[in-house]
Amino acid sequence: MSNSKENKWRISVVTPTLRRPEEVDGLLKNLSAQQQLPIEVIVVDGAPEHENATELVVNRLRDSLPFAVYFIRHNGGTAIQRNVGIENAKGGLIALLDDDVRLEPDFLKKMVAVFSSDADSHVGGVVGYRTNRHFAAADSQRWRWYKRLRLLSVYEPGRYDFECGYPINNNMQPPFAGTREVDFMTTACAVWRREVFDSGLRFDPFFSNYGVLEDAHLSLRAGKRWKLLQCGDAHCIEMHSPNGREDRRKIGYKSVINYYYVFSDLAGPLSAGQQFRFWRFQAFELLRITMSAVRRRRLDDVRDVTGRLRAIGGLIRRTRRNERTLVINAKS
């Protein structure tokens, strides 16, 4: 990794993908319209060797793009794919972009302006504003219940609740100008100072195969040393492509296991109060999705509940094993 003075504000884009050739095509064309062009785009494809649709897209567009584009085949899930891209990036700034995100033409220029105004280099990362993802908590029945039952101790978008282990959805932030400080950043549209990664920080291998909350885990670890900001002037949209996504059973499972891992890793050892608040929140989520499955008769909700129950059972069994080990060690 190089970070010479002339390289300081040059941007490398890292994008993991899986079976989304059309989305990658759209992203590369979108990036070519940026007022401040990246020096390179690194596409890391998780598809097996015989599936070459995305590689063909990259090869077809390569010569017409105003930046270098590299194709790397590497599976293991988006967290591992991003690590591979980061290792190969040359820019002083590294943009982590999802393949289904489309940036406004001045997006990268606005991001660079935030970093260049940070004279003391305290800012480690800046996340953009997804204009099509905003919702108000008052309009969400789920979030109204969260507040009514006092399940959370903080409700500011972009903050992490260290009392119950839940990240507060950044999309609840109304449109704004300038920057504001956050605890975590999505990997959909964030730009990082390369020194953050030069220090050795990477996405945790725990999030291999299918990541849920890997972005918050990375951000919260980075936030121990660096300031993280959201730029309200750097606009983009997220199309939320249905292609290449896992089934709801795995998402439900990860929504328990990964949340517990992040909470215990960053706030542990967890107190009895933190454990209670974590499981109270998980119990509410299980009840909410179960009721949705009954009311709407949606198979996806049933799969979600099945995954959550499997995860809860696994964590309970692991806790009991750990307790037995402690007792045995105490007696020996």
Please state what every model-predicted region is:
Residues M1-A33:
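N-proximal low-complexity "stem/linker" segments adjacent to membrane-targeting elements
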Residues L28-F71, S116-D118:
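Acidic donor-binding segment of Leloir-type glycosyltransferases
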Residues A79, P157-F162, I168, M172-W192, ...:
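A recurrent flexible, glycine/aromatic-enriched loop bordering the glycosyltransferase active site
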Residues K250-N258, G268-S332:
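Non-catalytic, C-terminal membrane-associated alpha-helical segments of glycosyltransferases
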Residues M185-C189, N209-L218:
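Acidic donor-binding loop at a coil-to-helix junction in glycosyltransferase catalytic cores
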Residues I94:
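Short aromatic/hydrophobic "clamp" motif used to bind/position activated sugar donors
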Residues D106-Y155:
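Conserved donor NDP-sugar-binding/catalytic core segment of glycosyltransferases
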Residues I72-A89:
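Glycine-rich, basic loop-to-helix element that forms the pyrophosphate-binding segment
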